[in-house]
């Protein structure tokens, strides 16, 4: 039995190393929709990878709080540190209250927050999306992607 497993492992190793796997694209312009903790985390992680990041929130209180803070602080495993918001002459997250401005130049758009907010965004996003933009739902554990796709299709995407 050990020989059969060794043969299997060797065969799998050869087959997986001989394939040309597609290169992961690097996106430079990212929009994050939502002002909660998930959105702030995603924005800081994207900034830590060198992306130009715009964080959209329709709620002025969220943006005011974010702008008056020292930034978004990440601790633990992975990138750590404080990532600035709306600061001049340093890489920082751009906070924005206009949806069209937030998504216009984005290559990737992260849609964060609970399902009912994702639904609202999906209903208005169709008018603002362009061909080639990537839309990512975070979190994606609730079949919200199906509902979002449905609303986008109804909206003309």
What are these regions (language model features)?
Residues 43, 47-48:
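Gly/Ala-rich phosphate-binding loop of Rossmann-like dinucleotide-binding domains
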Residues 4-28:
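A short, basic/flexible loop-to-alpha-helix module at the beginning of a structural domain
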Residues 109-110:
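N-terminal Rossmann-like NAD(P) cofactor-binding module of classical short-chain dehydrogenase/reductase
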Residues 37-39:
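Hydrophobic/small residue at the entry helix of a nucleotide-binding pocket
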Residues 52-105:
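Conserved N-terminal Rossmann-fold NAD(P) cofactor-binding segment
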Residues 29, 52, 134:
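Residues at the starts of beta-strands that form the adenosine-phosphate
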Residues 30-34:
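Conserved N-terminal Rossmann-fold NAD(P)-binding element of oxidoreductases
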Residues 115-157:
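Rossmann-like NAD(P)(H) cofactor-binding subdomain of soluble oxidoreductases
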